[in-house]
Amino acid sequence: MAKKPKVASNTIALNKRARHEYFIEEEIEAGLELQGWEVKSLRAGKANIGDSYVTFRNGEAFLFGATITPLNMASTHIVCDPTRTRKLLLNKRELDSLFGKVNRDGMTVVALSLYWKNAWAKVKVGVAKGKKLHDKREDIKDREWQVAKQRIMKNANRG
């Protein structure tokens, strides 16, 4: 019997820090306007969206702070800028919705994950509100309690 081929994960990069530092109120999927070398680098998994956020200019949305490291084999006649701003591909209704929510007090749009959908690179952006220090501490307490609860249940089941 032949082995089943491993299914590769569609996720390229995650922004775990965003969920720690923000309350995510809404998530939207957006396309990215990429150059050829960027697509090759994404296929190799060389992306970081840890410090990325979305800004609006002239009625369009742009992703700032995302780093896509060029491959060593990248073309020499093209200038590869790893931190260039990349245009988000959203329809007018989604842009207006995001822009209206960002104009509210304390709201921002952050990149949550970068992934493949069929052959297209997509970014999941979230409309977020910043957490205070005590909110972060509550999250840590809840997480630790869940781990302790699992440990107690595991030991109780052993009998």
From Swiss-Prot:
InterPro entries: SmpB (IPR023620), SsrA-bd_prot (IPR000037), SsrA-bd_prot_CS (IPR020081). It is found in: Cytoplasm. Disulfide bonds: none annotated. CDD domains: SmpB. It holds the Pfam family SmpB. The keyword Cytoplasm applies. Its main location: cytoplasm. One of its GO terms (molecular function) is RNA binding. The keyword Cytoplasm applies. Signal peptide: none annotated. GO terms for cellular component: cytosol. Belongs to the SmpB family. Required for rescue of stalled ribosomes mediated by trans-translation. Binds to transfer-messenger RNA (tmRNA), required for stable association of tmRNA with ribosomes. tmRNA and SmpB together mimic tRNA shape, replacing the anticodon stem-loop with SmpB. tmRNA is encoded by the ssrA gene; the 2 termini fold to resemble tRNA(Ala) and it encodes a 'tag peptide', a short internal open reading frame. During trans-translation Ala-aminoacylated tmRNA acts like a tRNA, entering the A-site of stalled ribosomes, displacing the stalled mRNA. This is SsrA-binding protein.
